[in-house]
Amino acid sequence: MAPEQWEATSQVSLTFEDVAVLFTRDEWKKLVPSQRSLYREVMLENYSNLASLGFPFTKPKVISLLQQGEDPWKVEEEGPGGFSLGLKCSQRTTKSTQTQDSSFRELIMRKSKRKEPWNMKSENLSIHEGKLEEKWDVNASTIERSYKSNELSPKSHREKRSSECEKQISYLSNPLGITPDKRYKCSMCEKTFINTSSLRKHEKNHSGEKLFKCKECSKAFSQSSALIQHQITHTGEKPYVCKECGKAFTLSTSLYKHLRTHTVEKSYRCKECGKSFGRRSGLFIHQKVHAGENPYKYNPGRKASTSLSGCQRIHSRKKTYLCNECGNTFKSSSSLRYHQRIHTGEKPFKCSECGRAFSQSASLIQHERIHTGEKPYRCSECGKGFTSISRLNRHRIIHTGEKFYNCNECGKALSSHSTLIIHERIHTGEKPCKCKVCGKAFRQSSALIQHQRMHTGERPYKCNECGKTFRCNSSLSNHQRTHTGEKPYRCQECGMSFGQSSALIQHRRIHTGEKPFKCNTCGKTFRQSSSRIAHQRIHTGEKPYECNTCGKLFNHRSSLTNHYKIHVDEDP
């Protein structure tokens, strides 16, 4: 199109006033900061779109103000309506109708909630430049003819101009006529998105691209928002605080779930026994008790049956991947695959230092820190470092003293629900973690893992000072205190300090007189379990300690040590 033709058509087709949205002073005051920000975004974007099409107009003053981050009006420049755009108007009178303001308010409220754009970005317009010019030729000539036929009747023109300009604005917003709901489709899984940025973020899930790396632990993420959320684990920051009880959380979603404990009644009721729950997930888990096992089986990777009733259908939308072995459900197929390794025993992630294998890459990364000595999670109170966020969270309880979960049997307060479950097994006698080699059972999986190292001979924890190795991290920590001389456990009664917490517990029994270990044969009690075991050999006649020189047997190690002195004295 020739420049003179562009100039002619632009005078009668579309000016910046046509796409500008006006607010009065009172209306502007009612907008919250996020809505004002969205207003700036839309105005600048509309101006950019018009400028990219070559419209011959000078930059309006409102655009200059918005680009500088200022409000779109100055007090001294206010017009009678309380708002001045600072525009150079054309022949026609630009009016801010109540309908237009109301429409924008609806749009701005809707976008602030849904986080969706109104129109296509300027770069998308340039992609379809050829089609844009073709469409513009048609619309420009149509509007020009309309203008000539009505140029003697300004009122008639203004009425028709409104509908024609709306068409042009609609075209600028969506040059290809694509529906605004879902425009962009992923070529890998055919999932659709409303904008290109969402599509690009989604495509990183397929490509595995992770551009955002944590400087503390080197963990990489595909999105910057995920990195920001992860970095809170290092700083220990908990910006979301419950106003009811003061408990703090790292995520807003965690705070939202917690608030339900204060505000939401137990509205999810089991039809079988009448028990109520505060969350649907609690009811869903409880219903498995009645069902015995989940009857809706499926092939791995396929979604579970949706032919469920009542609240189960709600959960099938949230957790749709079902494990055939135990009936647990998961939100994604990848979570199901990770879980199934528990049943199959598959451990594809192997440590290059000690050869230990893991079912998940995150477990391997955490394990490797044992060898490197890296402790990226640091306590903000005392500066102590930890290899995992879970260990840091457990440590923080020392400073805060928070204990929210009480045992119904003994009243003991515990800091987490998982700790409470393990503690309750003391009362029930349940030991679900069983060693496949010797059959010995344990209350928790960590105790089983440590026990299994007795069979494998694995000692992954090494002292950097003397090179001595240990089966568990706590043994290494206790040993390292022999080098440093550190004794952090102090008795409040007498002031005596100890290098191990177990030594302090045993020492306290001297002050309290407590002897919890009782011999079943004679009823004698002892402060230590080892003392009871040694005592019971009197009844059984067991003598496990043998002298290598003369073969004599003893029931105590100390007796064997004293016996060795006889042979030492006999040597010339």
UniProtKB/Swiss-Prot annotation:
Matching Gene3D superfamilies: 6.10.140.140, Classic Zinc Finger
Keywords in alphabetical order: Activator, Developmental protein, DNA-binding, Isopeptide bond, Metal-binding, Nucleus, Repeat, Transcription, Transcription regulation, Ubl conjugation, Zinc, Zinc-finger
Major localisation: nucleus
Residues joined by cross-link Glycyl lysine isopeptide (Lys-Gly) (interchain with G-Cter in SUMO2): 121, 155, 238
Location of the KRAB domain: 14-85
Superkingdom, natural source: Eukaryota
GO cellular component annotations of the record: nucleus
InterPro entries: KRAB (IPR001909), KRAB_dom_sf (IPR036051), Znf_C2H2_sf (IPR036236), Znf_C2H2_type (IPR013087)
Function: It may play a role in renal development and may also be involved in the repair of the kidney after ischemia-reperfusion or folic acid administration.
Entry protein name: Zinc finger protein 354A
Organism of derivation: Mus musculus
Origin organism lineage: Eukaryota, Metazoa, Chordata, Craniata, Vertebrata
